[in-house]
Curated annotation (Swiss-Prot):
Source organism of this protein record: Drosophila melanogaster
Name of the protein this chain belongs to: Innexin inx7
Function, as annotated: Structural components of the gap junctions.
Biological processes per GO annotation: intercellular transport; medium-term memory; monoatomic ion transmembrane transport; phototransduction
Family to which this protein belongs: Belongs to the pannexin family.
Transmembrane segments: 24-44, 59-79, 113-133, 284-304
Keywords, alphabetical: Cell junction, Cell membrane, Gap junction, Ion channel, Ion transport, Membrane, Transmembrane, Transmembrane helix, Transport
Span list, region Disordered: 381-402, 415-438
Length: 438
């Protein structure tokens, strides 16, 4: 059994170094649904649990021959014999009985040949939006935050880093350098990040479209019975009526086998086939019905949440609670307001995922420095010109956080001493500005 599911083990392992670039709704699509469909494919193709997929009984025909013939040639049931009485031991199975080919209508069942292929293809379809988003995202978040998931312990390490297995906890000096990298990247990519948020929203909408397509396709694949499969299965569970599962996934079917007799005439053999494969099929599709229903509700709620972020991302209260939901922690409201006032939606989403990957200790440092250095995308059309301009003197609404270590000390030193003095000094001199790192 463990060997059967070894191929999906890599999608279930817990990794502390994994970088978050999407939300839980996205993960339900490309991780959980992908794994569920992959496991279903393995179950269908494995004979360890259900034995032979089909076993047919007929006098005068070798079993392996007729089994193979009836598996690749659709079996059928007689519609007239699919009555509304539940099957009981000793009674005739639904759809089985004598029939006249010229008068009676039959229902052919050929889908079971394609079930593993369809399930595997659907698993790939649920992974495609994630693959597209991962390509569009380009590893930007990972490049900035990789190795910083446990940086809350950095304050105790000072100048020495700590490695625990594959997990590396950086020293204080390394963390400070990473803060400077994040700050510079946010400023440098103000314009380049314009499409970042649009691609994320498109990928989330693509998840919903793909889910609706898979539900529609599955319904057609099962002859239009999938949409109502869940409610009908629950209803028939406690009634004497014929279960819809016995109609969609018949356990016993008929098969006609033709062969040449000794004299050359064609002989027809009426075979009764036990469909062990359908016992597994009905369980899989019942689970998929309830999972798809749950996933559809969650996906719609996720898109409603995305609409709220589009409408209220510049509201400081909404942002504070959103960041707290991403990862608990307290942030300075004045500094946060200063940053989001200068953010478009893409930059806001970039900050949101930074918060999802950074500790409170490090994210406070990032917000503190962005508060006074972030250009305004609505007014600062040339980011390069902004970077070449003299730094703006620090304002009182951006108070210095006493609990944070100094980052980029030459720049902050000039900021703190650059306010007008009693002697009429007007900020840093030209010689001081020349000392700033380029």
């Amino acid at each position: 059994m463990l060997n059967t599911f070894s191929s999906v083990r890599q999608y279930l392992k817990f990794d502390l170094t994994r970088v978050v670039i999407d939300n839980i709704v996205f993960k339900l699509h490309y991780r959980w649904t992908f794994v569920i469909l992959l496991v279903a494919t393995l179950l269908i193709t494995s004979r360890q649990y259900i034995g032979e997929h089909i076993q047919c009984l007929s006098d005068g025909v070798v079993s392996p021959v007729i089994n193979t013939f009836c598996f690749f040639t659709p079996t059928f049931t007689v519609v007239r014999d699919q009555n509304q009485t539940a099957y009981r031991p000793g009674s005739e199975p639904p759809g089985i009985g004598a029939f006249d080919p010229e008068k009676d209508t039959i229902k052919r069942h050929a889908y079971y040949q394609w079930v593993p292929f369809v399930l595997f293809f659907q698993a790939l379809c649920f992974y495609i939006p994630h693959a597209l988003w991962k390509s569009w995202e380009g590893g930007r978040i990972k490049a900035l935050v990789f190795g910083l998931r446990m940086v809350g312990l950095t304050r105790y390490l000072k100048n020495d880093s700590l490695r625990i297995g594959k997990l590396n906890i950086p020293s204080m000096a390394e963390a400070e350098e990473r803060v400077k990298d994040i700050r510079r990247t946010m400023i440098d990519r103000m314009r380049l990040n314009q499409s970042w948020g649009a691609h994320l929203v498109f990928a989330e909408v693509l998840n919903l479209i793909n889910l609706l397509l898979q539900i529609t396709w599955t319904n057609r694949f099962l002859g239009g019975q999938f949409l109502t499969l869940g409610p009908h299965a629950l209803k028939n569970r406690w009634s004497d009526e014929l279960s819809v599962l016995d109609l969609v996934f018949p356990k016993i079917t008929k098969c006609k086998f033709h062969k040449f007799g000794d004299s050359g005439s064609i002989q027809m053999h009426d075979a009764l086939c036990v469909m062990a494969l359908n016992i597994m099929n009905e369980k899989i599709y019942i689970i998929l019905w309830f999972w798809y229903a749950f996933l559809l509700i969650v996906t719609v709620l996720g898109l409603l949440w995305r609409i709220l972020t589009l409408c209220f991302y510049r509201n400081v209260t909404f942002t504070r609670w959103s960041l707290y939901w991403a990862k608990p922690g307290q942030l300075d409201e004045n500094e946060l307001l200063a940053v989001i006032d200068k953010c478009n939606f893409s930059n806001w989403m970039f900050l949101f995922f930074l918060r999802s990957n950074l500790s409170e200790f490090l994210f406070k440092k990032v917000i503190y420095h962005l508060a006074s250095e972030f250009p305004n995308p609505d007014h600062d059309n040339d980011v390069n010109a902004y970077r070449e301009a003299p730094p703006t003197p620090a304002k009182n609404r951006y108070p210095e956080l006493s609990g944070l270590d100094t980052i980029d000390s030459p720049l902050l030193h000039l900021r703190r001493n650059g306010s007008p003095s009693a002697g009429g000094a007007q900020g840093p001199s030209t010689s001081d500005m020349a000392k700033l790192p380029v």
